[in-house]
């Protein structure tokens, strides 16, 4: 299998598991196990720090909501249809 990354098409950013999920580099996958295989409810949850560069630059594209337990974070549920596999 060719290496690939998961790209969020509207922002051009890549998905990476962890606390901040959208980055310029993302994670390189070499197997079939990825965000598409373990998020099966039709959306991929993402998070960021409130008022960070990521948060402020994507406000018009992603509908961010404050998190209940971490006031310094925001989160969103992005439909899987907005992501694609991009081979490297």
Predicted segments, located by residue:
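Short aromatic-glycine-(Arg/Gly/Cys) micro-motifs in beta-strand/loop hairpins
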Residues: 1-45, 50-51, 56
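Short, mixed-charge low-complexity intrinsically disordered segments
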Residues: 37-88
């Amino acid at each position: 299998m060719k290496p690939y990354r998961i790209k969020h098409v509207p922002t051009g950013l890549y998905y990476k598991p962890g606390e901040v999920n959208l980055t310029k580099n993302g994670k390189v996958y070499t197997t079939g196990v990825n965000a598409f295989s373990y998020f099966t409810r039709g959306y991929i949850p993402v998070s960021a720090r409130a008022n960070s560069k990521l948060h402020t630059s994507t406000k018009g594209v992603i509908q961010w909501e404050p998190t209940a337990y971490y006031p310094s974070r925001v989160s969103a549920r992005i439909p899987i249809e907005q992501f694609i596999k991009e081979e490297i």
